[in-house]
Regions:
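Internal alpha-helical scaffold of NAD(P)-dependent oxidoreductase catalytic cores
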Residues: 1-81, 107-114, 120, 124
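Terminal amphipathic helices with adjacent charged low-complexity linkers/tails
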Residues: 86-87, 100
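A short glycine/serine-rich beta->alpha loop
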Residues: 88-92
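NAD(P)-dependent dehydrogenase/reductase Rossmann-like domain
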Residues: 119, 124-133
Length: 133
């Protein structure tokens, strides 16, 4: 198991985790690195959800079986099966994915950096979520 930690109390919390869990790896990184890592992980997963919703749309349009197509895409270990389930609500929701994708976009804008792929995933997701409400 691998953990990232940052801040002034890393030593204390690393000891607590090692005592509780045994053989683990802990990286002591800067707080900015921790925050961006969380935002990017959740943004990647949100983008993956949006992508697989488009896979679903094309399967519906062509008569292909989404479950079969998604299964075989996910069998590629570089892709995996997480975040490929199509829900009745469609797209990504919940608390973390919308919040973190929005925060990452705002951070990028503040630093004059484009995240156009993520922006498109959010726009597509907003369209999906509107259509099902």
């Amino acid at each position: 198991t691998h953990f990232m930690m940052g801040g002034d109390s890393v030593g204390f919390w690393a000891d607590v985790l090692i005592n509780a869990m045994g053989n683990i790896t802990i990286d002591n990184v800067g707080v900015s690195d921790l925050i961006l890592t969380k935002y990017f992980r959740n943004s990647f997963l949100a983008t993956k959800v949006a992508f697989f919703n488009q896979v679903y749309d094309l399967c519906q349009a062509t008569g292909a079986d989404y479950e079969t197509v998604a299964k075989h895409i996910g069998n590629d270990t570089r892709i995996g099966h997480s975040h490929t389930t199509i829900t009745d609500e469609r797209g990504f929701g919940g608390h973390c994915l919308p919040k973190d994708t929005s925060a990452l976009i705002k951070t990028a804008q503040k630093h004059n950096t484009q995240l156009s792929i993520l922006e498109e995933a959010i726009n597509y997701n907003n369209t999906l979520r509107k259509d099902t409400n």
